[in-house]
Amino acid sequence: MNGNAYAETAIKKYFVKELDVFGIKILGLKNTPDTKMQNAKSILEQWLDNDNDKKPDNILVVNQLVENNCSMTMGKSIRKIDNILDKKLIKEGVSETQVNRMFALASNEPEIAYLEEILHMITSCGYAKVYPKIFGEEKGTKIALAMDKARGGFFDKVPKSYPKDAWYTYDDKYCDYSCMITEYFYWSLTSYLGIQKNRFDEISEEWKFNTKEKMKKDLLMKDLLNNEKFKIPKIAPSFN
């Protein structure tokens, strides 16, 4: 049994439920409600096939996700999922690289979390790899330069305080620079699509450009989002 087959067997031992979107897997622990997995499937489909023509909008991104076995894992709590990913699968011999490509989503999370976590997988495991100089999650890429502007400067680690003119002020010390880029992509795109427009009071300590109008001031990121080459979604996914 080769490494990939062994890893797949070990993964299926715990994640006994499976759905598929263009070859990308949504994996569920035994107690994950089927309706919640279908919700995740719908959101993934809409992010990837935003024009609803039953084909991926950006086949390069989808191929990257499939080839690298990037997947969404689901369970009733993040604690349960993380216990499987970080302990049991590693003990079973699944590589750390593979585990890092398995993104977690608790089924009891609100709808906004489904939009966020699934988009994280697409951008971090897809766009960042297909377009490394543009969306790569490291210093000096186009998106990193846009983020540095949004944060009021380059900060390898979370600063004690952000400059007053910053509009992206995430202060989670466990979120490193690459993680900050993942979150920045999420905040930018979802704000541009109108998803955050009624959430300012809830999110303003972390993110202030919560509408499309405000995002027009983020010139660097606005240009990336509107570049037709990248086929970035133009319509916010909806829950069926």
Q: What are these model-derived regions, one by one?
A:
Residues 28-32, 106-110, 170-182, 205-213:
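Conserved aromatic-histidine-acidic binding/catalytic patches
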Residues 7:
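Short, glycine-/small- and polar/acidic-enriched structural segments
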